[in-house]
Amino acid sequence: MTNEELAKEIALGIIKTGVEGSYGSVSCSTAGDYPSMGVSQWEGLGGRGDLLLSYLDGGSYFAGRSYSDIKYRGELPALKALLESKQGQIAQQMILAQDCLDRYVPQLKRVPTLDDSRCFIYAGIWCPTSEYVVRQFLTNRFTRCNLRSLEALKNLFKDEYYIGAGVGEIYKDGYANRAENTYYYVAGIDLTTPYGVPIYGEAGNGR
């Protein structure tokens, strides 16, 4: 698979597993009074959230505004509907795929032995937590974990990622559930029809 194809599938995985949010997600950023929007919680008020809005008919109405202003005017449902529209979904897929291509794929390419397509996509779906942490986590463990095995990779994230990410026991169960859900998603996607990747379980290296 090409870098662009890998980025596209990572983006779809992030969206379909809902690890960051849904198309219509709108919340107040923890960093300030501006909205965090969509499947990657892009932030508005001059950030990438405003870039997303610029692609949408009527999006300019919400661009550059604080979360509290939108909320107190009772316009959160309208913003949510705009993000959930077909146009909103396509724009989010496009921006997220570009983010994956620019940020996640280059970092994962630096991990030794991470050259199976499904395993690469699996790791990519974890990258919103921090692509740098994911890269270092896998690089530190590739000599004792088969990164070409989707099941082994799942168990590694399930058992150890909360340690590698330095977030403590409070995230252990949540990360374990995320590891399982992501595993079942990636194991079930069809990479054979569009890309010619061998069916899952029939080849050790699918890229």
Regions found by a protein language model. Give the residues of each.
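Cell-wall polysaccharide-cleaving catalytic domain and substrate-binding groove, primarily
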Residues: 1-112, 117-120, 124-207
